[in-house]
Amino acid sequence: MSLPEFSMRQLLEAGVHFGHQSHRWNPKMADYIFGVRNNIHIVDLTQTVPLLHRALQAISDTVAKGGRVLFVGTKRQAQDAVADAAKRSAQYFVNSRWLGGTLTNWKTISGSIRRLRHLEDVLSSADANAYTKKERLELQRERDKLNRSLGGIKDMGGLPDLIFVIDTNKEDIAIQEAQRLGIPVAAIVDTNCDPKGITYLVPGNDDAGRAIALYCDLVARAVIDGISRAQGDVGIDIGAAAQPLREDLPAAQATTFQGLPGPRGTPDDLKKLPGVSGAIEKKFNDLGIFHFWQLAELDQATAHQIGEELGLPSRADAWVAQAKSLTAEAE
């Protein structure tokens, strides 16, 4: 893997250079503005390109050192792109309303996450039958409300090491909390925003869907690059994991998974894997999966097959990558 490449042409085609109407500008962004066209400020992409590369490098370096990245984008245009990019790269996200204190009052947020996990476990188990229909409906509503706000960070396990933000005006509370805690901020900063306090500033359009999708894709790929570098540092052969199966191996054998009848000794805490709750861990166990090494040995097709069975196919690659890393650490 390597840091994702991009060109100025890609930025132009995505509309990254279009700022806001000139009368809505923030004078502190003057240094990053190329000019005005049809009363619209044009962002200087000759500055955006190196600054975006710098931000991607910082994100990759953070993950390579074992750090966590939190994607933040609660505006309508960013919600899906932020969630998809975070899931694809086994990271974390907030794409609904930012709860005040998400970072600065993590202890309280952790309590809400525990409540969310409890509700998920109760509603997915036979214990749910002990409640009346009305009580189950109330529990489901509470779970859904908590999941909207906390679902993207319930597996984070602690404060992030860097946050990536779309629209610094809308996410000003998140940025202030990160600054108070000394957490670096990489952010897309439009011509109507204040660049003060942004660690890795990237001047560009923060409203266009294509531009947001491009930013999120590049950041996700930078994270994956960092994960690959981290695995390389602990001696995992990334190239070997990507090699095709030997030709003399029957195709059916390549996708057939044989689980264990029970754990061999103490089972591993599978909740350490991204997106795995207590309920998902139980489903893993039902499939005969109790240890990280079992996942680390899976080929891509089998991993995706298991992901489909658990209802989380997009997490399969991240599970295998994390399992390999945890297995290497244990050795």
Swiss-Prot record:
One of its GO terms (molecular function) is structural constituent of ribosome. Keywords: Ribonucleoprotein, Ribosomal protein. One of its GO terms (biological process) is translation. InterPro entries: Ribosomal_uS2, Ribosomal_uS2_bac/mit/plastid, Ribosomal_uS2_CS, Ribosomal_uS2_flav_dom_sf. The keyword Ribosomal protein applies. It holds the Pfam family Ribosomal_S2. One of its GO terms (cellular component) is cytosolic small ribosomal subunit. The keyword Glycosyltransferase does not apply. Signal peptide: none annotated. It comes from the Bacteria. Belongs to the universal ribosomal protein uS2 family. NCBIfam families: PRK12311.1 (NF008966), rpsB_bact (TIGR01011). This is Small ribosomal subunit protein uS2. It comes from Rhodopseudomonas palustris (strain ATCC BAA-98 / CGA009). The gene is rpsB.
